[in-house]
Curated annotation (Swiss-Prot):
Organism: Mycosarcoma maydis
Listed name of the protein: Pre-mRNA-splicing factor CLF1
Pfam annotation, one family: HAT_Syf1_CNRKL1_N
Bias (Low complexity) ranges: 724-755
Gene Ontology terms: cellular component: post-mRNA release spliceosomal complex; Prp19 complex; U2-type catalytic step 2 spliceosome
Gene: CLF1
Length: 781
């Protein structure tokens, strides 16, 4: 008996088809409804007491089973509080604290419950007990001092802070204590606390904040003493000074604010002399800024800037003399130099006259630069020129804040561009965004509308839509999308974004209608212009229906797309969507379970495990969808085979194999692997070759292609055998005729032949017999 799988002669579909929908419907019908708890209605006091007793028994049973679960204690106590039984509530909390006194949420819920019931003294006592047991938990201390301050007990608040400070807490705790004293104008107390704080946390940031505190309260000598204490603590160790560079910088800046420039210079030099240049970048940069403002560094900086100005002027003069087109890179560098000089002067606190002169120089450079209008009408020559206008407008808006001048710059740039030949969307968009920043929304809309009417571009539509969506003007955004589609209905991105807008607005009908219009545009072909990238619209449409869990529509879309293109990637995506459908359904079920099981105590509530029935249902669903995916893979394979697309068949088999490795069995995987082709080397004639040259090439031979070709191969083999037999028969007849002629000639030679002649005749006869035997053997063959 043959062990091979039986050959299927009838490949027609079965008369009764079982679909995945029927399987799911039958499983749903057989599923039993979950049992629901009956609704209780309390009619009188006795029923209420019975209900309370039953609930208490339930809680006590839970605690007996697991008394270490603090969430059960908290729920029990909260329930007693909701019943108005505060004594029982306190008793439960105290029992819980006996079990686990170091559980922070227990203390917090206990104190919150007391404060909710306006039992302030109880809350105080609880906080006192809590900070005694958990002194390292800052949250308890913060709540304790906040309660005391709310009650107006400032001395009590100080006592709590003093108890807290004995534990040397973090810096924020010390700052909270200091802020308390500052709020009640106890600055001397705050200064004393600062001294204790830097003793506990002697880091540079604390020294600086203490000195700033003393400076703000007007005690400048105390501020200097603080910095001197900090420098004494730091010492002259190189590593310590490197970490404390901010202390030296803050000390010098304070002296600068007090106009003690020599003191500040001495501090900078003291630090720079003791630190190498590689480790003193921060101090050196501060010292450079200081000298620029108050020392001789200003003249040095002015000299450097002056030399660079002369260099740029010489380059520009050489370009004008040579008649070469304008080099906008030089103008960019020149304008950047003047802008940096203005910003440096502004940062160092230059006088008003100096700032005005710097602004005047920047404007002069920009005006000279934008006067170099390109002579050609090619967009590539205008691109960098337009960026000069944009930088000029940004300088006026951000640095000088001359908004009227900024608006005039944008208008002049737009008037200069030949919009009939080309336009710059960035220029229009930046102008509109400027008006938005000035809260001139109407002007921004007019600008973008004029841009679209004068020279429509996709970026202009996108920016206009982005503006309206950010302003929540969705109706306006819809109108702009409609205008964009009227202008260019072949743009796939516009269709997709329009539909995504409707989807985000939860208008699925409009989104689906837009996708249908986009697909219809793609299916229209040359008559309607088609789409530049129709696959984007199809993919977005399918993903949309998949997210909406419209499985029938997903299948219908795939079938439509396959009827149109039949690409192997579409087949693969169609097949994999079946198994992805099972994952999506399971995720939806898990989300529904999470919504039902949601509770305030997220950490204490374990995730729900699936029952055996639910697990079996999911497994059954996955198996059904996996079978559907296999059917699609088989359809795809047959389709590609009929179209003789070998490379696409290999790609399909690779995806099919990966699918079976994840979701199939060893049997299904072996079936797919058996379909893989083998590579063979063949020869063929070179195209357009006059001498009939041959070339070798590699071809893919599929097993099922070989099986179908076996019948034709046998017929051809029989034809070759018949032809060979006919040729052998003709050759035998010719040999027989020649041998009979030779025999007659030897007989007429005479009877008086000698014995030698007889021997020769016998040898001839033997040779003839050998020839006859050879012919017979050839005929049989």
């Amino acid at each position: 008996m043959s062990r091979s799988a039986p050959r299927i002669k009838n490949r027609a579909p079965a008369p009764i088809q079982i679909s995945a929908e029927q399987l799911l419907r039958e499983a749903q019908e057989r599923q039993e409804a979950p049992a629901s708890a009956p609704v209780q209605k309390i009619e009188d006091y006795e029923e209420l007491e019975e209900y309370r007793g039953r609930r208490r028994s339930e809680f006590e049973d839970r605690l007996r089973r697991n008394g270490l679960n603090m969430s059960t204690w908290i729920k029990y106590a909260s329930w007693e509080a909701s019943q108005g039984e505060m004594d029982r509530c306190r008793s439960i909390y105290e029992r819980a604290l006996d079990v686990e006194p170091h559980h922070l949420p227990l203390w917090l819920r206990y104190t919150e419950q007391e404060l909710k019931m306006r039992n302030v003294q109880h809350a105080r006592n609880l906080y006192d007990r809590a900070v005694s047991i958990l002194p390292r938990i800052d949250q308890l201390w913060y709540k304790y001092v906040h309660l005391e301050e709310l009650l107006g007990n400032i001395p009590g608040t100080r006592q709590v802070f003093e108890r807290w400070m004995k534990w040397e807490p973090e810096e924020k705790a010390w700052h909270a204590y200091i802020n308390l004293e500052v709020r009640y104008d106890e600055l001397d107390r705050a200064s004393a606390i600062w001294e204790r704080c830097v003793t506990c946390h002697p880091v540079p940031k604390q020294w600086i904040r203490w000195a700033k505190f003393e400076e703000d309260r007007g005690n400048l000598e105390k501020a200097r003493i603080v910095f001197q204490m900090a420098l004494d603590y730091i010492g002259e160790d190189e590593d310590a000074m490197e970490k404390a560079q901010s202390v030296f910088t803050a000390f010098a800046k304070m002296e600068t604010r007090l106009k003690e420039y020599e003191r500040a210079r001495v501090i900078y030099k003291y630090a720079l002399e003791r630190l190498p240049r590689s480790k003193s970048e921060g101090i050196y940069s501060s010292y450079t800024r200081f000298e620029k403002q108050f020392g001789t560094m200003n003249s040095v900086e002015d000299t450097v800037i002056g030399k660079r100005r002369i260099q740029y002027e010489e380059e520009l003069a050489a370009q004008e003399a040579g008649g070469a087109p304008a080099d906008y890179d030089t103008w960019f560098d020149y304008s950047r130099l003047e802008e940096d000089a203005y910003r440096a002067l502004l940062a160092t606190g230059g006088s008003q006259d100096q700032l005005q002169q710097a602004v005047k120089r920047v404007r002069e450079v920009y005006e000279r630069a934008i006067a170099q209008v390109p002579s050609s009408q090619e967009k590539r020559d205008w691109r960098r020129y337009i960026f000069l206008w944009l930088r000029y407008a940004l300088f006026e808006e951000i640095d000088t804040r001359d908004y009227d001048r900024t608006r005039e710059i944008y208008k002049a740039a737009i008037a200069l561009v030949p919009h009939r030949r080309f336009t710059f969307a960035k220029l229009w968009v930046q102008y509109a965004r400027f008006e938005v920043r000035r809260l001139e929304l109407t002007a921004a809309r007019k600008i973008l509308g004029a841009a679209i009417g004068m020279a429509p571009k996709l970026k202009l539509f996108s920016s206009y839509i982005e503006l309206e969506v950010s302003l929540k003007e969705f109706d306006r955004a819809r109108k702009i999308y409609e205008k964009a589609l009227e202008w260019d209905p072949t743009n796939s991105q516009t269709w997709v974004r329009f539909a995504e807008l409707e989807k985000n607005l939860f208008d699925t009908d409009r989104a689906r209608a837009l996708f249908e219009l986009g697909v219809g545009q793609a299916e229209g072909g040359e008559a309607s212009g088609g789409l530049d990238m129709p696959e984007i619209v199809w993919k977005a449409y399918i993903d949309f229906e998949f997210e909406e869990r419209e499985w029938e529509k997903v299948d219908a879309l795939y079938e439509r797309l396959l009827a149109k293109s039949g690409h192997v990637k579409v087949w693969i995506s169609y097949a994999l969507s079946k198994i992805n459908r099972a994952t999506a359904i399971e995720e939806d079920e898990d989300e529904e379970d999470d919504d039902h099981d949601h509770d305030d105590d997220m950490a204490a509530t374990p995730s729900r495990e699936l029952t055996e029935e639910e697990e079996a249902l999911r497994q059954q669903r996955r198996s059904a969808l996996a079978s559907s995916a296999r059917e699609i893979f088989q359809r795809a394979y047959d389709n590609l085979k009929s179209r003789s697309l070998k490379d696409e068949r290999v790609a399909l088999l690779e995806s099919w194999k990966s699918f079976e490795q994840q979701h199939g069995s060893a049997e299904t995987l072996s079936r797919v692997e058996a379909k893989f082709p083998r590579v063979v080397k063949k020869r063929r004639q070179v195209e357009d070759s006059a001498d009939g040259a041959m070339e070798e090439y590699y071809d893919l031979i599929f097993p099922d292609d070989q099986d179908e070709g076996k019948g034709a191969f046998k017929l051809l083999q029989m034809a070759h055998a018949w032809r060979a037999a006919q040729a052998a028969k003709e050759q035998q007849q010719q040999q027989q005729q020649s041998s009979s002629a030779e025999t007659g000639a030897s007989a007429s030679a005479g009877a008086g032949a000698t014995g030698d002649d007889v021997r020769d005749e016998e040898s001839i006869g033997i040779a003839i017999d050998d020839d006859q035997e050879q012919d017979a053997s050839g005929e049989e063959a």
